[in-house]
């Protein structure tokens, strides 16, 4: 029988990819735990929206966040074993998504209050989680320098999620 529990974390430590162990309340664990939360919230967004284009974008972002999370969950040895990392291509893809969505949704005329419909509200929850991730990466970078691409991707991600929420809010069938 395959077990998902190992009992190795019962004393408050967890293993990084590469073999080293750190405390479960370490900022690195907080950061990749936030990535995990965000991936799950994006699953809620995916299940909530009826827009095929947004669903495709959400799925792609989830896959990319797994790559980002793997890098955060790796020690120096593990980093050398990663097959994929976040790069300029992923950042550019988010920028194109943002530009396309903002052109489609039109200019902002006032502050956006989340809740116009369930899909946009869920995207705004994901946006705030991505902002938390960005804050954690900024703090983590001071003690454990991160690659610039990770910080840039997390910065663009919250804007991408905002732009996706705007698409949901401007749909003809959006609630008033």
Locate predicted features.
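Phosphate/pyrophosphate-binding loop motifs in nucleotide- or prenyl diphosphate-using proteins
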Residues: 1-176
């Amino acid at each position: 029988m395959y077990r998902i529990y190992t009992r190795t974390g019962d004393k408050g430590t967890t293993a990084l990819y590469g073999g080293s162990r750190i405390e479960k309340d370490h900022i690195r664990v907080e950061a990749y735990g936030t990535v995990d939360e965000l991936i799950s919230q994006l699953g809620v967004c995916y299940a909530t929206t009826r827009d095929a284009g947004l669903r495709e974008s959400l799925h792609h972002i989830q896959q990319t966040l797994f790559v980002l999370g793997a890098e955060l969950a790796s020690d120096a040895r593990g980093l050398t074993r990663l097959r994929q990392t976040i790069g300029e291509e992923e950042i550019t893809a988010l920028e194109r998504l943002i530009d396309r969505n903002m052109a489609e949704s039109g200019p902002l005329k006032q502050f956006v209050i989340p809740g116009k419909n369930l899909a946009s509200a869920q995207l705004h929850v994901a946006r705030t989680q991505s902002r938390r991730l960005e804050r954690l990466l900024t703090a983590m970078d001071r003690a454990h320098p991160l690659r610039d691409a990770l910080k840039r991707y997390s910065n663009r991600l919250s804007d991408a999620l905002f732009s996706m929420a705007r698409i949901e809010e401007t749909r003809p069938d959006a609630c008033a």
